[in-house]
């Protein structure tokens, strides 16, 4: 709290509303067989965020945090809000770019929009997360580029 008070310049800082915002999307690289489960698991877990049936939800409840999943790119539509959906999954990165530059910008802007909305709703502390089968493979690829290391 001391750090947050310092950042905000408010020594009487009180955080009344907190949210965890998992951004849910499917990864086209799954078609390469890089995962233990199928892509359909992304939608199942995303809907479980809504019903509170995930470990992230259990931990969030313990600290009074609301879980607000966002469909930013799942391959199918679910009960999760798709208002900010960029695409129905990404392309297979082994065959070409997973996303266009415009899609990448749109995805970043979707995150910015969620922060804006939640701030307007009075949320004082936000955490983000992700859910998408194949995400370890895509994260490894990003880390490889950023760290200039082979996978």
Which residue ranges define each predicted feature?
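N-terminal loops that bind phosphate or other acidic moieties
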Residues: 1-151
């Amino acid at each position: 709290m001391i750090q947050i008070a310092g950042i905000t310049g408010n020594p009487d800082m009180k955080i009344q509303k907190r949210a965890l915002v998992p951004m849910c999307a499917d990864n086209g690289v799954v078609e390469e067989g890089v995962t233990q489960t199928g892509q359909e698991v992304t939608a199942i877990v995303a809907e479980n965020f809504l019903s509170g049936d995930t470990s992230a939800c259990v931990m969030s409840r313990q600290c009074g945090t609301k879980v607000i999943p966002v469909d930013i790119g799942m391959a199918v539509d679910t009960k999760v809000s798709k208002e900010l959906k960029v695409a129905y999954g990404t392309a297979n990165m082994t065959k070409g770019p997973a996303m266009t530059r415009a899609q990448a910008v749109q995805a970043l802007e979707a995150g910015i929009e969620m922060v804006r909305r939640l701030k307007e709703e009075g949320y004082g502390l936000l955490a983000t997360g992700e859910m998408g089968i194949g995400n370890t493979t895509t994260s490894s690829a990003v880390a490889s580029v950023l760290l200039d290391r082979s996978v």
